[in-house]
Regions:
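Outer-membrane beta-barrel pore domains
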Residues: 45-48, 92, 103, 193, ...
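Short hydrophobic/aromatic segments of transmembrane alpha-helices and their interfaces
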Residues: 7-8, 54, 131-132, 324-325, ...
Length: 374
């Protein structure tokens, strides 16, 4: 059933539209989308991971301005076979920033707030995919002021989830600072924090699990299972990035603390991290703005080539929960035909300790064709 939180946010959005001084002649509409097609081939160890293909993302969006202060965005995801809302919000421009009312990304993690159109590897790291709240319904505010960036929000669950019982609320924030800020030379640091309540059910549960890098497989080799009697969950994150011409380095650590009843085994702590380096063989540089990375534009008509390497690890074992540990090394090659069309190749070697099916060491070859338009 739809929760009181969703109803309150929905009422606020409707009220906002009704009371805004709408002038239809001033409204603008921009339409765009993205298509990402993946293939993955696994060298299995213990678990059959099922090689295959998929539409990783297939999205259409409409966005624009209602007047000089108010704007909107609606983005739908079709890759799952059902139409899902990726983003759906009304925005209000504040001095140097924006307030978003609806479903949007929670301000947490450099890799998460960087669009999938611009991330260096086919998939974000396991720590980011497992712990970061991603898109939620709520009120999100962000502001960039010189070398500083701020983001904060209060939110419930994703609008595409059916929730029985009262939806757990969450708060979160991100602060980033770029002491070096030039077109092709950037040094970035950031801190993230979030506190989230579980949905108000009899069990009050959370669960953490991670794929072996590739999204094509639905199999998770590490999994805490359902953790019950949870009071709340705290997430902390540290992030850093450096760009100097064609060279780039980026790293994050995310820690999670589960506040749990003593009768269920007490509190739990899990964490994960990643670090990667990349190099543009053709001389391009990763563009940075508003504490996130953006679109790469090749310098010439022959396109741009980028090579990258990443190490990541995640630990889902603590106390009486044996979810397992996973370490992954990924090598990547990206070919940017132009600023809208990109081909990606990733090879990942995975090592799992104490996972769902014990210890194992699978690997994966992954390919992606990605295009976006607007």
């Amino acid at each position: 059933m739809r929760t009181r939180f969703h109803a309150a946010v929905g009422s606020l959005l409707v009220a906002t539209i009704l009371i805004s001084p709408l002038a239809l002649a001033d409204m603008t509409v921009n339409v765009g989308g993205r298509i990402q097609v993946d293939a993955a081939f696994f060298d299995d160890d213990v678990t059959n991971l099922n090689s295959g293909t998929e539409f990783r993302r297939a999205r259409l969006f409409a966005e624009g301005d209602i007047d000089e202060n108010w704007g909107y965005k609606l983005q739908l995801e079709f890759a799952t076979g059902d139409e899902l809302i990726a983003d759906g919000f009304i925005s209000y421009r504040l001095t140097g920033g924006k307030l978003l009312l609806g479903q949007s990304k929670v301000p947490f993690s450099l890799e998460e707030v960087t669009s999938s159109k611009y991330i260096t590897f086919m998939e974000r790291s396991a720590a980011v995919n497992t712990f970061v709240p991603a898109r939620r319904v709520g009120a999100i505010w962000y502001k960039t002021a010189g070398k500083m960036h701020y983001g904060a929000g209060i939110f419930g669950q994703n609008s595409n989830l059916d929730v029985d019982g009262d939806e757990g609320l969450g708060i979160g924030g991100r602060v980033a600072y770029a002491p070096i800020l030039h077109d092709d030379n950037v040094l970035h640091f950031g801190v993230n924090a979030s506190l989230q309540e579980p949905t108000d059910t009899d069990a009050e549960t959370v669960r953490f699990r991670a794929r072996p890098t590739a999204h094509v497989t639905g199999t998770r080799l590490i999994d805490t299972g359902v953790i019950t009697n949870v009071n709340d969950t705290t997430y902390l994150g540290l992030e850093g990035a450096y760009v100097n011409g064609p060279f780039s380095a980026q790293a994050e650590w995310i820690g999670t603390r589960v506040d749990r009843a003593a009768s269920a085994g007490g509190d739990l702590a899990f964490d994960g991290y990643y670090a990667f380096v990349s190099w543009f063989l053709t001389g391009e540089s990763r563009p940075y703005k508003g504490a996130t990375f953006g679109r790469v534009t090749p310098k010439n008509k022959r396109g741009a080539w980028e090579i990258a390497a990443r190490y990541q690890a995640i630990d889902l074992t603590d106390g009486n929960i044996t979810g397992g540990e996973q370490e992954t090394i990924t090598l990547g090659v990206n070919f940017y035909v132009n600023k809208y069309l990109r081909f990606m190749f990733n090879y990942s070697s995975v090592e799992v300790t104490g996972g769902v099916n014990g210890d194992e060491e699978p690997s994966a070859f992954m390919l992606r064709a990605a295009i976006d338009f607007k």
